A protein has these predicted regions:
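Extracytoplasmic gate region of multi-pass secondary transporters
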Residues: 87-88, 92-96, 163-213
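Hydrophobic core of transmembrane alpha-helices in multi-pass small-molecule transporters
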Residues: 35-52, 260-274
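Glycine-rich segments within core transmembrane alpha-helices of 12-TM secondary carriers
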Residues: 68-104, 296-308
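C-terminal ends and interior cores of transmembrane alpha-helices
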Residues: 17-32, 244-257, 340
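Intracellular juxtamembrane helix-capping segments at the cytosolic ends
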Residues: 51-65, 273-288
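Helix-to-loop junctions at the C-terminal end of transmembrane segments
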Residues: 1-8, 95, 222-235, 316
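C-terminal transmembrane helical hairpin of 12-TM major facilitator-type secondary transporters
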Residues: 233-279
Length: 363
């Protein structure tokens, strides 16, 4: 509804300014020291990020030839992964820094209050800097707000967007995003404990946690490479291949031990790389002016990251960590089925256009 009312560029400005406000809300949150105030600031920040996701994904898909939309979106998502890989370290340096070495045990009265004040100042300075950068970016986007020719459309009931789920291809794609995010977060959540197991790598907690960077870093590298691959191969075929690879890697990891078991599960991050942008673009094909509505529904589907990990944890409690990998494996099986569906749809469309088969409406 926001995009219908304001257009893509102005909606992007709203998203950036919402993120800026969220960052600034960390100032009173750090001063109060109350957890609920941090949650409020985080909620506002996350709302702005969601607006940017809803706006940016269909916008990037539309800026160029439809045939290369998958590649463009994958390339853009690579920078998302770059931030995910780098900024935890940057944040640790900026926010934790020397504070991580301070032991609060035994501190009371003025000494403890002074430490808390110092912690608040560190948080304030970090988030003020981020807010300034976001505000500057919002100003730049605002200056170029009229560079993109947009046709404003009447604002419709937000619930009308769910009518898009009547399209089998779009509904299947939204389910694919749900499964993908759930599987990715599930593996990322259990990987540290998985690598600590005696029959895997038997690593101490810190070393196992450090290996987690390779899992998320694999997604970054894979997206840069995937942007090139998607210009040369059919997106549905590439998605089919990486989903099958993820299934194979999880199976090998669960059935093996030692270095092979640990390495293959980490490598699933590489297989994850092109899944989100490719599923998104395959599901959104043909939506036209309703692309922003579809983007909103797909962004809602990332709730899989909150639902599937607890199911994976339950499976681990009932069996073992190795047994719990069946949950993400089943998720990737669903993604593989979506890729197969899209592949068949493309082949039927090509035959229809060449006059070798009757028209079939699958999307």
């Amino acid at each position: 509804m926001l995009v219908q009312r304001l257009g893509y560029m102005r909606s992007a400005v709203v998203g950036l300014l919402t993120m800026t406000a969220g960052c600034l809300l960390f100032l009173p949150a750090s001063t109060s020291g109350l957890f609920v105030t941090f949650l409020g600031a985080l909620f506002v920040l996350a709302s702005g990020i969601t607006i940017i996701q809803v706006v940016a994904n269909p916008l990037i898909s539309a800026l160029g030839e439809p045939a290369t939309a998958h590649s463009r979106l994958t390339f853009a998502q690579a920078f998302n992964s770059l931030g995910t890989t780098l900024f935890p370290y940057v944040g640790a340096i900026l926010i934790l820094g020397t504070l991580a070495t301070v032991n609060e045990t035994g501190l009371t009265g003025e000494a403890l209050a002074a430490l808390r004040a110092q912690e608040a100042r560190v948080i304030d300075h970090t988030y003020v800097g981020i807010a300034a950068a976001l505000g500057l970016l919002a100003a730049v986007v605002w200056l170029f707000r009229n560079r993109l020719a947009e046709t404003r459309r009447p604002v419709t009931n937000p619930l009308a967007s769910f009518a898009l789920l009547a399209r089998p291809r779009f509904a299947f794609g939204a389910l694919g995003i749900f499964l993908y995010v759930g599987a990715e977060v599930s593996i990322g959540s259990l990987l540290t404990n998985y690598l600590m197991q005696a029959d895997t790598l038997a690593l101490p907690a810190q070393a196992a946690g450090e290996r987690l960077a390779f899992y998320w870093g694999g997604a970054m590298v894979g997206r840069f490479v995937g942007a090139w691959l998607l210009r040369r191969f059919r997106p549905a075929n590439v998605l089919l291949t990486v989903a099958g690879s993820a299934i194979g890697l999880i199976a090998i990891s669960a059935l093996s031990t030692g270095l092979v078991s640990g390495t293959t599960l980490i490598m699933v991050g590489l297989a994850n790389s092109i899944m989100f942008p490719t599923i998104f673009s395959l599901a959104s094909e043909g939506l036209g002016h309703r692309a922003a509505e579809g983007s909103g529904i797909i962004c809602m589907a990332i709730v899989g990251g909150a639902i599937i990990p607890p199911l994976t944890g339950l499976a681990a409690d009932l069996t073992t960590l190795r047994g719990a990998t069946i949950v993400p494996l089943l998720c990737y099986t669903g993604i593989m089925a979506f890729a197969r569906y899209c592949r068949v749809h493309v082949l039927l469309s090509e035959r229809t256009e060449s006059g070798n088969a009757p028209a079939t409406e699958l999307a």
